[in-house]
């Protein structure tokens, strides 16, 4: 005859714990963040996606500005490097077309976020320094800029902006 005492005991314990697990809930964790350094690499296939890419920035910055962290500009360092089609959103002549996106970038620039544009892409698009918004800094190359800041200890975040096929309500 087989000894089934241990498996039976384990099954009984699992079944006894199941109702408690159903009524359990998630817990909030307050990770003790200290002086975060983030580098956003933005390279989009369509300028209309810039708004969605900025939600990645919001998801990083806003929780750090609010309690319990309440960081100030000098408590964190955030750099955004633009080098794709989104470059047109920071051209002064396109401000009316991308007004909401520009206002959001201007807000974050006021919070200490640095917005940098690839100088090579700037030339490729036929823009000059005077064509750019005042909060923009132009770097020699996005690639060298990204490597430089990663070598300084910045964490790289590359927003992935896909086409939205379903509303939140449809998939909830």
Predicted regions, residues:
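Structural recognition of the beta-strand scaffold that forms the well-ordered cores
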Residues: 38-41, 79-82, 114-117, 157-158
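Acidic/histidine-rich, surface-exposed loop or edge segments in extracytoplasmic proteins
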Residues: 32-45, 82-87
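Acidic helix-start/capping segments at beta-turn-to-alpha-helix junctions
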Residues: 71-90
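A cross-taxonomic marker for long C-terminal extensions/tails that follow the last structured domain
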Residues: 88-172
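Sec/Tat signal peptide C-region and signal peptidase I cleavage site
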Residues: 20-24
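Bacterial N-terminal signal peptides
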Residues: 8-18
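Positively charged n-region of N-terminal signal peptides that target proteins for export
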Residues: 1-5
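Histidine-anchored nucleotide/phosphate-binding helix
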Residues: 51-71
């Amino acid at each position: 005859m087989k000894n089934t005492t241990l498996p039976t005991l384990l099954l009984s314990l699992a079944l006894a714990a199941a109702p408690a697990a159903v009524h359990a809930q998630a817990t909030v964790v307050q990770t003790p963040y200290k002086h975060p350094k983030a580098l956003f690499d933005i390279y989009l296939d369509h300028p209309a996606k810039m708004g969605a890419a900025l939600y990645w920035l919001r998801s990083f910055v806003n929780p750090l500005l609010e309690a319990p962290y309440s960081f100030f500009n000098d408590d964190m360092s955030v750099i955004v490097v633009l080098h794709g089609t989104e470059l047109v959103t920071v051209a002064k002549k396109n401000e009316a077309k991308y007004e909401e996106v520009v206002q959001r970038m201007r807000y974050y620039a006021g919070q200490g976020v640095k917005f940098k544009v690839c100088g090579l892409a700037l030339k490729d698009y036929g823009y000059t320094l005077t064509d750019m918004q005042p909060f923009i800094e132009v770097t020699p190359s996005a690639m060298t800029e990204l490597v430089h800041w990663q070598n300084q200890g910045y964490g790289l975040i590359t927003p992935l902006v896909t086409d939205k096929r379903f509303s939140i309500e449809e998939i909830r």
